[in-house]
Amino acid sequence: MSGKSIFDKLWDRHVITGDEGQPQLMYVDQHYIHEVTSPQAFQGLRDAGRKVRRPDLTFGTFDHNVPTVNIFDIRDAISKAQIDKLAENVIEFGIDNASHGSDKQGIVHMVGPETGRTQPGKFIVCGDSHTATHGAFGAIAFGIGTSEVEHVFATQTLWQVKPKKMLLEFTGKPQKGIYSKDYILALIAKYGVACGVGYVVEYRGEAIDRLTMEERMTICNMSIEFGSKMGIMNPDQTTYDYMRGRECVPEDFDAAVADWKTLVSDDDAEYDKVIRMDVSELAPMVTWGTNPSMGVDFDTPFPEVRDMNDERAYHYMGLRPGQKAEDINLGYIFIGSCTNARLSDLQLAARIVKGKKISPNLTAIVVPGSRPVKRAAEKIGLDKIFKDAGFEWREPGCSMCLGMNPDKVPDGVHCASTSNRNFEDRQGFGAKTHLCSPAMAAAAAISGHFVDVRRMPEVQ
């Protein structure tokens, strides 16, 4: 009998009833909510006369609609209604939360790990497609729809069909200037946005082992852009060191670690699909089109038109085959989002811009992903470095990742963005998004166009 993967072990721990291959009822350990996908679910509970079954396993955040200049100046009526309704709902149903304006406020996929609620072995859901972020800790974590949010509220369970398993092994040692964002963008560019459909992706290999937890979260975050709603990594000493001392970790932390160590994949675990990628061959990545697979490394020209999707993307972006990333005339820079707004991301960008000025006629903003990150960054002077360089230093929130709050890219303007999606109109009507690492975004802010960060002395 073959061994089990970490996913197998966690799945088996959480099955309540049902046969494999059919929908199985799964127990949910942690339910994260935010203001956009929860209002209808709460109303469904009221209409049925139900309560939240386990408010102690539910945690709320305010992030998508929150302004980042004056966080309480919410002028859009729908955004304000969603914020106000979540504030009412968490009180009515007795749910702990990182309230709007509190010292814990931030993006849901940052607040969970920061508070220690995200832990190895847990089954985690949230009404948000980037919930796979939490899989970096050795948890099953994925996004759900609003009707499923209501089901979890009412029962603390969810019906799911077990997905197939993919092993994705990152090998080799990267060149300087290559980061985990480049790993995942290169993977998606090579294999497409549908490769992971129907699979849980287990990321493994020496290149993963060397990453910090913040870098690992970046990779798991974009599992959904690879087509998989779940990404997972084996917990290790890096995981435990990150978690130790955080607010919500188990009181007997050493005993918890002893259990977590049993959850890693067995050497003889079997997978339905295996992909290997050598990161030593990677160059800095930039997207040119309107989905995350439309990307190239800095050394490679944009591809020829292969189909109608390419033709439409080139038309929307105002680009053409044969151009290169350095030819893009940038007008905006966005460093933020649940993909790349952690302290290490801001430190990396600050090293590059320190003592310099952003290019004229360019707008550049930095949005820490949470208030703890903002405080930590200010404590070591990162805010001053960015402001001296001409960046706007904002309050935490989802910000310019999506056009759901005041932070939008103007129509027709190209933006270098550390976020996760480059769809048409994602950052605002007519916005032209180019996904990249924090290093590439910071360097582009200074030059006004993309440059090869491998050549910069500030880059390690």
UniProtKB/Swiss-Prot annotation:
Give GO terms for biological process: L-leucine biosynthetic process
Biological pathway? Amino-acid biosynthesis; L-leucine biosynthesis; L-leucine from 3-methyl-2-oxobutanoate: step 2/4
Q: To which protein family does this belong?
A: Belongs to the aconitase/IPM isomerase family. LeuC type 1 subfamily.
Give the record's keywords alphabetically.
4Fe-4S, Amino-acid biosynthesis, Branched-chain amino acid biosynthesis, Iron, Iron-sulfur, Leucine biosynthesis, Lyase, Metal-binding
Which protein are we looking at?
Answer: 3-isopropylmalate dehydratase large subunit
**Swiss-Prot/TrEMBL cofactor(s):** [4Fe-4S] cluster
Per the entry, what this protein does is:
Catalyzes the isomerization between 2-isopropylmalate and 3-isopropylmalate, via the formation of 2-isopropylmaleate.
PROSITE patterns, A to Z: ACONITASE_1, ACONITASE_2
The GO terms this record gives for MF are: 3-isopropylmalate dehydratase activity; 4 iron, 4 sulfur cluster binding; metal ion binding
Species lineage: Bacteria, Bacillati, Bacillota, Bacilli, Lactobacillales
Q: How is the cofactor bound?
A: Binds 1 [4Fe-4S] cluster per subunit.
Q: What is its EC number?
A: 4.2.1.33
Q: Tell me, what's a Pfam family for it?
A: Aconitase
- Classification via SUPFAM superfamilies: Aconitase iron-sulfur domain (SSF53732)
Q: Where does [4Fe-4S] cluster bind?
A: C338, C398, C401
Q: How does it assemble?
A: Heterodimer of LeuC and LeuD.
Q: What InterPro entries has UniProt attached to this entry?
A: 3-IsopropMal_deHydase_lsu, Acnase/IPM_dHydase_lsu_aba_1/3, Acoase/IPM_deHydtase_lsu_aba, Aconitase_4Fe-4S_BS, Aconitase_4Fe-4S_dom, IPM_dehydratase_rel_enz, IPMI_cat
Which chemical reaction does it catalyze? Answer: (2R,3S)-3-isopropylmalate = (2S)-2-isopropylmalate
The organism of origin for this protein: Streptococcus thermophilus (strain CNRZ 1066)
